[in-house]
């Protein structure tokens, strides 16, 4: 019971600090920015818990190449590329009526950003190698430790995608500032 009280107290403080409760009323995208180790993942999970979303699909964008991220997000059909021995449901389809958490979103290439933008805007996409249109209603929560304005200015991140994923923004304090 003492650990439960401790966790509840921490959650109350986080809600208060970041006004997270207001974010859970809506299904609009949330963008979390903060240095490594500041709790971006914790905030994303907290949004999921407070919004009582049943599904929470987590994707670390920095661990995939362009080809693999497309397959992971959108799925693929058997034979669509070497090694595609079976059909695979994409994580965006799996996140239907739930939340997809795109961690380290800054790591996506411009090509992947373009495809993701279309899927976010239209809530539909084609799996790799398929002509079957998949519709999926998902909420995007994304995070990065990078300065997005600098990346946009340098042409490394699409301004239109950033506008779509950052309806609500949470800027976490650095560890020094805390």
Task: Spell out what each predicted region is.
Residues 65, 164-166:
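Short amphipathic alpha-helical segments, especially helix-boundary/capping motifs
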Residues 153-157:
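Charged helix-capping and loop-helix junction motifs
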């Amino acid at each position: 019971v003492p650990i439960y009280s401790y966790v509840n107290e921490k959650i109350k403080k986080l809600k208060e600090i970041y006004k997270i409760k207001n974010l859970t009323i809506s299904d609009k995208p949330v963008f979390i920015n903060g240095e490594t180790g500041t709790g971006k993942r914790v905030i994303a999970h907290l949004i999921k818990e407070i919004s009582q979303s049943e599904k929470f699909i987590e994707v670390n964008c920095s661990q995939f190449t362009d080809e693999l991220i497309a397959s992971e997000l959108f799925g693929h059909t058997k034979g669509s590329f070497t090694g595609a021995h079976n059909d695979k449901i994409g994580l965006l389809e799996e996140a239907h009526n739930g939340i997809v958490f795109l961690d380290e979103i800054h790591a996506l290439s411009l090509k992947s950003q373009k495809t993701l933008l279309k899927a976010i805007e239209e809530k539909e996409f084609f799996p790799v190698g398929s002509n079957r249109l998949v519709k999926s209603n998902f909420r995007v929560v994304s995070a990065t430790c990078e300065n997005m304005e600098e990346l946009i200015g340098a042409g490394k991140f699409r301004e239109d995608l950033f506008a779509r994923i950052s309806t609500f923004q949470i800027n976490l304090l650095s560890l020094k500032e805390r």
